[in-house]
């Protein structure tokens, strides 16, 4: 379990937040690829391989990092409907 936690921590280091890049949205390695864009591509049905082919400067670990970041965000104690 500790090894898994270390792996996730290593992945999360790939996520950067810089007010000068994409208006401060969480991005992949300081590049102009917001985490939400990666998640939208995946939820739209693109495979990891298709994403990597379309965005040459991304690495497989970047996609895993986006998923790990999203998973971490869902670990909240309470979610309030935004309706």
Segments and roles (model prediction):
Residues 1-83:
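Small, basic N-terminal interaction modules of short regulatory proteins
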């Amino acid at each position: 379990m500790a090894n898994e936690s270390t792996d996730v921590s290593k992945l999360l280091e790939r996520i950067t937040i810089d007010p000068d890049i994409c208006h401060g949205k969480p991005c992949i390695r300081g590049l102009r690829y917001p985490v939400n864009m990666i998640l939208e591509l995946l939820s739209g049905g693109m495979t990891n391989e298709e994403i990597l082919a379309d965005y040459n400067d991304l690495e497989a670990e970047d996609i895993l990092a986006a998923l790990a970041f999203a998973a971490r965000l869902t670990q909240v104690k309470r979610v309030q409907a935004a309706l």
